[in-house]
Curated annotation (Swiss-Prot):
Homodimer. InterPro entries: Herpes_TK (IPR001889), P-loop_NTPase (IPR027417). Disulfide bonds: none annotated. The gene is TK. The lineage of its organism: Viruses, Duplodnaviria, Heunggongvirae, Peploviricota, Herviviricetes. Substrate binds at Y101, Q125, R222. This is Thymidine kinase. Changing C336Y: In strain: Isolate CL24; acyclovir resistant. It is an enzyme of class 2 (transferase). It comes from Human herpesvirus 1 (HHV-1). Changing P173R: In strain: Isolate CL20; acyclovir resistant. Changing A17V: In strain: Isolate clinical CH/1. Changing Q89R: In strain: Isolate McKnight, Isolate clinical CH/1, Isolate clinical h20, Isolate clinical h21, Isolate clinical h22, Isolate clinical h23, Isolate clinical h24, Isolate clinical h25, Isolate clinical LA/1, Isolate clinical LA/2, Isolate clinical MA/1, Isolate clinical PR/1 and Isolate clinical PR/2.
Length: 376
């Protein structure tokens, strides 16, 4: 092959330029890395925060357990962020919970179509999710890196949340899809809106035998609720799949690589109680991903349309970093409280980002509770 001097000179010039560019970039990166290292050292000197999200199917005893735990601490070191009942019932819309249950009942009785029910359910679920999503966004600037859990000193502040945003933006929409009152497209639209998972996100899911769960749910009184056993079975199934999905992802599972292992479009059978991270990695068929092998989401060649595949990528990205714990609710309220307290010792704290973050977070949590915590 012929060799051309001009090309040789150009090549030599390019090599010199690249070498000089790499050198300049290395020089430029040094101050940046030094600054980042300094910021990390400063952050590590900041107070720590423990955030605990008590989640899972309704009616297990989450709120009672949480309130008993909060009562153990002082007002200054543990703050409870309750369900935003006032927003659901008054501020965001009128009687949202009753509207949801009535709509499902009318669909089950054949009084309205699935399409009509889906319109109402999707709108109502937006109302249910808004307070969680916006609170997460306001809190995010104050959350620094994870401080670890082993041998960590007590946090300066513990925040106990009655549910994480995924309850309203993933789990309940997915359960309504199983109930026939929401489309899979709408569920993935909610998935796309799940906020990025903050460091130190500790989520407590619950385990309770179904018969005991039914008994507890029948005895409680919540505004607008109906005893819907089919919905209870659906939401229990979804939370079981959620726990499996986190284990699957943290165990190295990739939904894109394993998608071909799903066959047909059948909804998975009801599974066992949520399990901790112990044990083998679940099969993709025992995760939330199996719900989305639905005809409405598939292209003619049988693959997911890209827009829906991207939503599943978001789902994987949001769930993978979560720290999931399982609380056994099949015991007395005091026993549940003590078991939850024991779980917190293994949870992951985070540093806050500024010296004023702790009082700011306290004010945020108390404002939320005061404005939205109780229905008027």
């Amino acid at each position: 092959m012929a060799s051309y001097p001009c090309h040789q000179h150009a090549s030599a010039f390019d090599q010199a330029a690249r070498s000089r560019g790499h050198s300049n970039r290395r020089t430029a990166l040094r101050p940046r890395r030094q600054q980042e290292a300094t910021e990390v050292r400063l952050e590590q000197k900041m107070p720590t925060l423990l955030r605990v999200y008590i989640d899972g199917p309704h009616g297990m005893g989450k709120t009672t357990t949480t309130q008993l735990l909060v009562a153990l601490g002082s007002r200054d070191d543990i703050v409870y962020v309750p369900e935003p009942m006032t927003y659901w019932q008054v501020l965001g819309a009128s009687e949202t919970i009753a509207n949801i249950y009535t709509t499902q009942h009318r669909l089950d009785q054949g009084e309205i179509s699935a399409g009509d029910a889906a319109v109402v359910m999707t709108s109502a679920q937006i109302t249910m999710g808004m307070p969680y999503a916006v609170t997460d966004a306001v809190l995010a600037p104050h959350i620094g890196g994870e401080a670890g859990s082993s041998h960590a000193p007590p946090p300066a502040l513990t925040l106990i949340f009655d549910r994480h945003p995924i309850a309203a933006l993933l789990c309940y929409p997915a359960a309504r899809y199983l109930m026939g009152s929401m489309t899979p497209q709408a569920v993935l639209a909610f998935v796309a809106l799940i906020p990025p998972t903050l460091p130190g996100t500790n989520i407590v899911l619950g385990a309770l035998p179904e018969d005991r769960h039914i008994d507890r749910l029948a005895k409680r009184q919540r505004p607008g609720e109906r005893l819907d056993l089919a919905m209870l079975a659906a939401i229990r199934r979804v939370y079981g799949l959620l726990a499996n999905t986190v284990r699957y992802l943290q165990g190295g599972g990739s939904w894109r690589e394993d998608w071909g292992q799903l066959s047909g479009t059948a909804v998975p059978p009801q599974g066992a109680e949520p399990q901790s991270n112990a044990g083998p990695r679940p099969h993709i068929g025992d995760t939330l991903f199996t719900l989305f092998r639905a005809p409405e989401l598939l292209a003619p060649n049988g693959d997911l349309y890209n827009v829906f595949a991207w939503a599943l990528d978001v789902l994987a990205k949001r769930l993978r970093p979560m720290h999931v714990f399982i609380l056994d609710y099949d015991q007395s309220p005091a026993g549940c409280r003590d078991a939850l307290l024991q779980l917190t010792s293994g949870m992951v704290q985070t540093h806050v980002t500024t010296p004023g973050s702790i009082p700011t977070i306290c004010d945020l949590a108390r404002t939320f509770a005061r404005e939205m915590g109780e229905a008027n």
